[in-house]
Design a protein with these regions (language model features):
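Hydrophobic anchor at the beta1->P-loop junction of P-loop NTPases
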Residues: 425
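Extended, folded cores of ATP/NTP-driven motor/assembly subunits in large transport
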Residues: 1-384
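Hydrophobic positions on the alpha1 helix immediately C-terminal to the Walker A/P-loop
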Residues: 436
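P-loop NTPase motor core of the ASCE superfamily
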Residues: 93-96, 101-105, 121, 152-155, ...
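Post-Walker A helix-loop "phosphate-sensing" segment adjacent to the P-loop in P-loop NTPases
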Residues: 442-452, 471-474
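P-loop NTPase motor domains
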Residues: 12-13, 23-31, 37-56, 61-64, ...
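Conserved lysine of the Walker
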Residues: 433
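Walker A (P-loop) phosphate-binding loop of P-loop NTPases
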Residues: 430
Length: 818
């Protein structure tokens, strides 16, 4: 390294001692274990396109470091921020239980880097070293060329869903420093600041180094490096996937050198001519040579007629250990993994220094032991494999089926390429949708997240009712919404985005959509423009009159204003229309059949930590659509309030297909999914009726597109085709979904496909015994047993309230099960 110029936040540029320039791109891996043959072929083609588009050499680096599982899971406790004792206790219990059941000791953390190089004209003369000087103009000219190469590489990586990001100067210095100081960097991973008068190399390379024939000793670590001496006889997409199975830490470096294409053509033609002579002009023709000559002719013709290029590939992999004996074991494991794929790794005897330097992130192939391949084949060297799924931090949620690694889930994590916090959950009856979401709610509540949930249960033992009873009336509310419940949610309530006494344009638009449901004639989904114009004016009058008394209007107020307008109207057509509106509204006032739901001021606490609205008693189809619509609008207001207070907010709509059955509901759900990012909220849409959900296909597609996370549980076979097309699932993923076991163990170990952005993976949802007894809604055995346990606890502790009984019951049932 000659220098790393610029400020820390600038794009990282490394100038090497020979005058060459380097820039760096970091990217994410892809869990390709569920990809089918077509997907893998496409990935190989994209990687070949990346190699073809590069006009200079590139180095691809994979750094795999093993994070102790306890340290990995500590990310959950670091996010907990609640002053509620029971939630703190539950988070601690979950954390300890999840640690106890781990069957892995570490979680591999894989980082992927691409080093793009450029050799300027003033350093191509190998007969004399670079002077170390060039004019500012020349330097900027060369950097512009390098930037163009980086942009080309960047776009190719982005097209492959690898989420590339150009590293800053500080990130580049830290990357190099960590490799040169393996022990020091564990104490502080940040490189020392550049010191005036001291070379960059001296600043970064501060550790002692000792070179032996078969290993290096660097900063207290024994390091061994091996190189690829013979690739497999035939490579295929995925032959490098076994790197995921390595239990050792390693740095894997691949160089792709662009060959001189003219020289390659001449060499191929010479080999062909030589083969023709040796195979045909001998006394006894060599049939094997004739056949190989024909194959060579085919390769030459294909190469000459296509845009394919020839590349020199070299591969190196280094690992470290605390002792020489342990290092030998690590190197043996690496060789064994490559041997299983038909490749040979050489120990690098007497070549350890050059081999190790070829793994450093400076884009220099010191050893240069290369293997020539054509561009279709270079695509099979795709190295960006990962077995991870979930999010970088969050709540413990399950285990990856492929790697057994713990899976964390944080809907609110911030990452590149993340559009929204929304989640889409789909599964057939009994697949465990409500169970999974109940468990997620239980683990997100200690993180300070507030929840509103809409559900329509079959009986009084709803999937979420017990969860509210467990947390208690001080924290939760379970609202049985219905015409006869006595509980009212006023649709005219204003939110923080509305001025006092004056509805915003969005509020008026939402009310007009509500009146589409209430007043639209049979056969029509909505009112016409003229009818909406009349109602718009009446709504403003109702708000103005109520505002004089420092109140918001209720449905009776609007009905009265409408009746008064009809009485004073002189135009017969308008009078008839207003009278028709007034009669229609009267059905939804206290004098009408449905007024008990919407006519009056909101009469329950809307500021609980967790609120569940159960619409089981809303049976009329039109009233049901109204109720779900009003509740969804209530969610929008709560999201705006939480944003104003800086609180996390999540809304769950269980069976979101209810909203998709009518246009106004579909538009509202679509609008809410789009605005969720603005509010910083999480919207969870749950459905089992996929065909109903797609009744309004445009809005349904938009809702799913705005869902960064998706949980796909066991499916009805008839829905798999729609699901595959909608979510663009591979054949392998569909096969995995078909193989998800039925709920014979009552969701104690259910399986699902988890999609977080571009990362797909199958996971096992493994609740703790206490989670199970909180979240279960199994009516034949579980609920009666839980109820009986509560009675026993009450008989022994008469002073316990209902919340205490719930908490003790699940605790003892969990202990018994465990």
């Amino acid at each position: 390294v000659h220098s790393i110029p610029g400020e820390d936040n600038d794009e990282g540029l490394v100038v090497l001692a020979d005058g060459c320039l380097r820039k760096y791109i970091a990217c994410k891996g892809i869990n390709a274990l569920l990809f089918d043959e077509l997907d893998r072929e496409q990935m190989a083609n994209q990687f070949a396109a990346l190699a073809n588009s590069c006009e200079s050499d590139i180095q691809i680096i994979i750094k795999s470091r093993n994070l102790p599982v306890d340290e990995y899971l500590s990310k959950y406790q670091s996010l907990v921020k609640t002053d509620i004792d029971y939630l703190n206790w539950y988070a601690d219990h979950t954390d300890k239980w999840f640690r106890d059941i781990q069957d892995v000791h570490f979680v591999p953390q894989r980082e992927f880097y691409i080093v793009v190089g450029y050799q300027p004209d003033d350093c191509k003369d190998f007969s004399k070293p670079w002077s170390g000087r060039r004019s500012v103009q020349k330097h900027e000219e060369y950097v512009d060329i390098l930037n163009r190469l980086v942009r080309t590489c960047f776009e190719q990586l982005r097209a492959s869903n690898l989420r590339p990001q150009v590293l800053s100067r500080k990130e580049v210095r830290d990357l190099i420093y960590i490799e040169l100081n393996p022990s020091l960097s564990q104490l502080d991973p940040h490189a020392p600041t550049t010191i005036a008068g001291t070379s960059e190399a001296s600043t970064l390379a501060v550790s002692a180094l000792k070179v032996t024939d078969d290993h290096l000793w660097l900063d207290g670590k024994f390091i061994g490096t091996q190189y690829l001496s013979a690739p497999p006889h035939e490579t295929w997409m995925g032959w490098l996937v076994d790197l995921l199975t390595l239990s050792v830490e390693y740095t894997f470096s691949t160089f792709i050198h662009v060959c001189d294409q003219d020289k390659v053509r001449k060499r191929l033609q010479f080999n062909y001519r030589t083969g023709v002579v040796t195979s045909t002009q001998l006394a006894t023709p060599d049939l094997d040579s004739i056949e190989s000559t024909r194959s060579a002719a085919t390769v030459i013709q294909e190469f000459l007629r296509s845009s394919n290029k020839a590349f020199d590939i070299s591969m190196y992999i280094s690992t470290n250990a605390e002792s020489k004996e342990k290092l030998i074991q690590h190197m043996d494991e690496i060789r064994r993994v490559f041997k299983n794929r038909g490749a040979t790794m050489d120990r690098g005897q007497m070549l350890q220094l050059d081999a190790w330097q070829s793994t450093l992130p400076v884009g220099v192939d010191k050893l240069a032991i290369v293997h020539q391949v054509m561009s279709p084949v270079v695509g099979t060297f795709w190295p960006f494999f990962t077995a991870g799924c979930g999010t970088p931090d969050g709540v413990p949620f399950g285990f990856a089926i492929a790697s057994r690694e713990p899976v964390l889930l944080n809907p609110f994590f911030r990452g590149a390429g993340k559009d929204a916090n929304n989640m889409f959950v789909v599964g057939t009856t009994g697949a465990g949708k409500s169970f999974a979401i109940s468990m997620l709610i239980l683990r997100l509540l200690p993180l300070g997240t507030r929840f509103v949930l809409i559900d329509k249960t079959v009986d009084k033992f709803g999937a979420y009712r017990f969860l509210t009873e467990l947390l208690g009336p001080d924290l939760c509310a379970y609202i049985d919404l219905g015409p006869g419940s006595g509980l009212i949610l006023n649709p005219f309530d204003l939110g923080p985005e509305d001025q006092a006494g004056t509805p915003s344009a969005d509020k008026v638009s939402t009310l007009l959509s509500l009146f589409d449901i209430m007043l639209a004639p049979e056969g029509r989904d909505e009112l016409n423009v003229e009818e909406k114009s009349l109602l718009d004016g009446l709504i403003h009058v109702a708000y103005m009159e109520a505002g004089l008394q420092n109140k918001v209007p209720i449905m009776s107020d609007l009905a009265r204003v409408t009746a008064q307008a009809a009485a004073s109207e002189t135009d017969p057509t308008q009078r008839d229309r207003l009278s028709q509106f007034a009669r229609g509204m009267s059905l939804f006032t206290k004098q009408g059949a449905f007024g008990g739901l919407v006519d009056g001021y909101t009469n329950f606490d809307t500021d609980k930590l967790f609120t569940v609205f159960d619409t089981r008693d809303v049976n009329d189809p039109r009233l049901e659509r109204m109720a779900v619509f009003i509740l969804t609008e209530f969610i929008r207001r709560k999201a705006a309030e939480c944003k104003l207070r800086g609180a996390r907010f999540a809304a769950v709509i269980d069976e979101a297909a209810m909203l998709m059955r009518f246009k106004a509901g579909a538009r509202l759900l679509d609008d809410l999914s789009r605005r969720a990012r603005h509010y910083g909220m999480m919207l969870v849409c749950i459905t089992q009726q996929l065909k109903d959900f797609f009744r309004q296909s445009e809005q349904a597609d938009s809702v799913i597109k705005n869902s960064h996370m998706k949980l796909i549980l066991r499916q009805d076979p008839s829905d798999l085709k729609v699901l595959k097309e909608t979510l663009r699932l591979s054949d392998a993923e569909v096969t995995a979904i078909e193989g998800f076991s039925r709920d014979e163990e009552k969701r104690k170990d259910s399986q699902m496909l988890l999609i977080v952005g571009a990362v797909h993976g199958t996971i096992r949802l493994v609740p703790s015994p206490m989670d199970y007894w909180v979240c279960t809604s199994e009516p034949i055995h579980d609920i009666p047993r839980r109820t009986e346990m509560m009675k026993q606890i009450k008989s022994k502790n008469p002073s316990f309230n209902h919340t205490d009984m719930c908490r003790q019951a699940v605790f003892f049932l969990g202990m018994h099960q465990e």
